[in-house]
C-alpha cells in the first residue's frame, strides 16, 4: 500500500519539516520560484508555484510515484491492458482521440479501424443535418437537437457545448435532458416543434431507467404530432452498444452509433456520445477537441514525471489529501462558459476515486478521493471565498483563466483576469494582523476601531492553489484541459492502488429504487424497510406520518 513504501516514510519526514513554512517566505527567498514550478504544453500554462512545496517535495513525490509503479501503470493504460481490475476491462478512452495513426490493441485486435469508422459515420450524419439533406417527417430541416442521457451521457456533452458557445452552429440548437423529474423534459419540449426536432437517446446499455423513461415520454410527445411510427426514423437516433434494445424501442439500427465496453461512461464524450457536440459545433470542431486531448495524452505518455502536467497535478493532490489532511478540492474557472466544469469534474473525480477498497480487495487505511466543487469566478468570490481565505479548513483551489475573450467587452475581461490573479495571490500571501493595522491607520481609523477590527482583517494565507492559464478557450484547448484532469485522476488512483474505472457505489441505491417504485403502488408498502423509509412511502400516498 501507499503508506508501506519507503518513499512514503521519507515524504512524512519531509512534511514535518516543510509544513510550518509560509509560501510568502518561500517566494521572498527564491526569485526563480515561478520558473521552476510551472510547466506548459502549447498555450496551456500550469503554474503550481503557489503550493506548499520546494524542490525536495517534488523529488520525493516523484520517488513515491515510481515506487508505486506509476510509469508502468501509464504504459498499461495506453497498451489496452485491463486496468479496470474489478470488471477486467481496459480503460481506453485515449483510443477515441488517438490521432497518431498508431495501432491500439484490445485482446489482440487493433480497435482504431472501428473508432475511425464511427467518427466517419458521425461526420456523414452531421453533414446531412447541417446541409438540410436530413429532414423531418414534414420535409423541414432539423433545427433543434435534444440529447437524452444521464451521467457521462449528459455531463460531458452538456459541459462541452456550454464551453464552446462561441462555436455554435447558427442553425442548430442543442438541448440536454437528464433528470427523471418531468420538469426538465417538459420545460425543454414546450418551445420545440416535433417536425424540426431530433432526439439523441444516449445510453450504453439502453437500459438506464431515467434515460428510457424520458425517451418514451419524448417519443409519445412526438407521436401525438406525427401520427405514424414510420416517422420515428427521421427524428430518433440511438447512441448505444445494445442493438437489440435499440430496435425494441423502435429506432432503426441504421440510426445507431455505437461505442464499446472499454469506454467508461464518464470518459465517453470522446466517443459517439459526443454526437450532440458534433451537431452543435460541427465535426471539424469536434475533431479539434479530440486533437487537443490527444496532445495531452501524448504528453502524459512520454514526458518524465518531473515535467509531466497530469502527474505533478495528481501528486500535489496526494500531498494535500494524505499529508495535510484536506478533504475537498475547489475548481474555480474564471470563464463563464466553463460554469459546468466543476459539476463535470465532480463525476470524473468522485466516481473514479471515491473508493475505499484496493484492487487487491483490501480496505485502504488512508483517505482517497476528495469532494470536488466550485463555481465560476467572479461569482464564487461573493459566495464561498470567505471560507477559502479565513475558514478553518485548508482547501486547495484550481484556478482556470483565458488571457483573451471571444467577446468585445475588453474592460470586463480585464477585470475578470485581474480578480483571478488577485485571488491566487491573496490565498498565498494572506495579510498579517500588523499589515491590517497599518492599512487601517493609513485610512484614518481611530485606535479603538483599529484594535477591534485587526483580528478580523488579518488573513493567514499559505492557502495552496494551481493556476491554469491559456490564450483563449478553443476546442483544442478544452480537449487538453479535460484530458489533463482525466489523467490527474488516474495518477491519484494508481498511487492509492484503487480502481479509478468502476462505480459499484451507484448500484445499491438503484436496486432499492426499483423495489420501492413497485411498492409505491401497493396497499401497505412497508415490508422489508426501516421505519423511516416505510413512513416516507406512506407519506407519498398521503397517509399521515407527521409527528404530533
Swiss-Prot record:
SUPFAM superfamilies: SIS domain. Transmembrane segments: none annotated. CDD domains: SIS_PGI_1 (cd05015), SIS_PGI_2 (cd05016). It catalyses: alpha-D-glucose 6-phosphate = beta-D-fructose 6-phosphate. Keywords: Cytoplasm, Gluconeogenesis, Glycolysis, Isomerase. It comes from the Bacteria. NCBIfam families: PRK00179.1. Belongs to the GPI family. This is Glucose-6-phosphate isomerase. It comes from Syntrophotalea carbinolica (strain DSM 2380 / NBRC 103641 / GraBd1) (Pelobacter carbinolicus).
Amino acid at each position: 500500500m501507499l503508506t508501506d513504501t519507503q518513499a512514503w516514510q521519507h515524504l512524512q519526514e519531509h512534511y514535518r519539516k516543510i509544513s510550518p513554512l509560509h509560501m510568502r517566505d518561500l517566494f521572498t527567498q527564491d526569485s526563480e520560484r515561478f520558473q521552476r514550478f510551472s510547466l506548459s504544453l502549447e498555450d496551456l500554462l500550469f503554474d503550481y508555484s503557489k503550493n506548499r512545496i520546494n524542490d525536495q517535495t517534488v523529488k520525493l513525490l516523484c520517488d513515491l510515484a515510481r515506487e508505486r509503479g506509476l510509469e508502468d501503470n501509464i504504459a498499461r493504460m495506453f497498451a489496452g491492458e485491463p486496468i479496470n481490475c474489478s470488471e477486467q476491462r481496459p480503460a481506453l478512452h485515449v483510443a477515441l482521440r488517438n490521432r497518431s495513426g498508431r495501432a491500439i490493441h484490445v485482446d489482440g485486435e487493433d480497435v482504431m479501424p472501428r473508432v475511425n469508422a464511427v467518427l466517419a459515420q458521425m461526420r456523414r450524419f452531421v453533414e446531412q443535418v447541417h446541409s438540410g439533406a436530413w429532414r423531418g417527417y414534414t420535409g423541414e430541416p432539423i433545427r433543434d437537437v435534444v440529447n437524452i442521457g444521464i451521467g457521462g451521457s449528459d455531463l460531458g456533452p452538456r459541459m462541452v457545448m456550454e464551453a464552446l458557445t462561441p462555436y455554435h452552429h447558427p442553425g442548430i440548437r442543442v438541448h440536454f435532458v437528464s433528470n427523471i423529474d418531468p420538469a426538465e423534459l417538459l420545460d425543454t419540449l414546450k418551445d420545440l416543434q416535433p417536425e424540426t426536432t431530433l432526439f439523441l437517446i444516449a445510453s450504453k446499455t439502453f437500459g438506464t431507467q431515467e434515460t428510457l423513461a424520458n425517451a418514451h415520454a419524448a417519443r409519445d410527445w412526438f407521436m401525438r404530432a406525427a401520427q405514424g411510427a414510420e416517422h420515428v426514423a427521421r427524428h430518433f437516433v440511438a447512441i448505444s452498444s445494445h442493438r437489440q434494445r435499440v430496435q425494441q424501442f423502435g429506432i432503426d439500427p441504421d440510426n445507431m452509433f455505437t461505442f464499446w465496453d472499454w469506454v467508461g461512461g464518464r470518459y465517453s464524450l470522446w466517443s459517439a456520445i459526443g454526437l450532440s457536440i458534433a451537431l452543435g459545433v460541427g465535426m471539424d470542431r469536434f475533431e479539434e477537441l479530440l486533437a487537443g486531448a490527444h496532445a495531452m495524452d501524448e504528453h502524459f505518455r512520454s514526458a518524465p514525471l518531473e515535467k509531466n502536467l497530469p502527474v505533478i497535478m495528481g501528486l500535489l493532490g496526494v500531498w494535500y489529501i494524505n499529508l495535510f489532511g484536506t478533504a475537498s478540492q475547489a475548481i474555480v474557472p474564471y470563464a463563464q462558459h466553463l460554469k459546468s466544469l466543476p459539476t463535470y469534474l465532480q463525476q470524473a473525480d468522485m466516481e473514479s476515486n471515491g473508493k475505499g477498497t484496493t484492487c487487491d480487495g483490501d480496505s485502504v487505511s488512508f483517505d482517497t478521493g476528495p469532494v470536488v466543487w466550485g463555481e465560476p469566478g467572479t461569482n464564487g468570490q461573493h459566495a464561498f471565498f470567505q471560507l477559502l481565505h479565513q475558514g478553518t479548513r485548508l482547501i486547495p483551489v484550481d484556478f482556470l483563466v483565458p488571457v483573451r475573450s471571444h467577446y468585445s467587452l475588453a474592460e470586463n475581461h480585464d477585470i475578470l483576469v485581474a480578480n483571478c490573479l488577485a485571488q491566487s495571490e491573496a490565498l498565498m500571501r494572506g495579510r498579517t494582523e500588523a499589515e491590517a493595522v497599518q492599512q487601517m491607520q493609513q485610512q484614518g481609523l481611530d485606535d479603538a476601531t483599529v484594535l477591534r477590527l485587526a483580528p478580523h482583517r488579518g488573513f493567514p494565507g499559505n492557502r495552496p492553489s494551481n493556476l491554469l492559464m491559456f490564450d483563449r478557450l478553443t476546442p483544442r484547448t478544452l480537449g487538453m484541459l479535460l484530458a489533463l484532469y482525466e489523467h490527474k485522476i488516474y495518477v491519484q488512483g494508481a498511487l492509492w492502488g484503487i480502481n479509478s474505472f468502476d462505480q459499484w457505489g451507484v448500484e445499491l441505491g438503484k436496486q432499492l429504487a426499483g423495489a420501492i417504485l413497485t411498492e409505491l403502488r401497493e396497499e401497505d408498502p412497508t415490508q422489508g424497510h426501516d421505519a423511516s423509509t416505510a413512513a416516507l412511502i406512506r407519506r407519498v400516498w398521503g397517509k399521515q406520518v407527521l409527528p404530533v
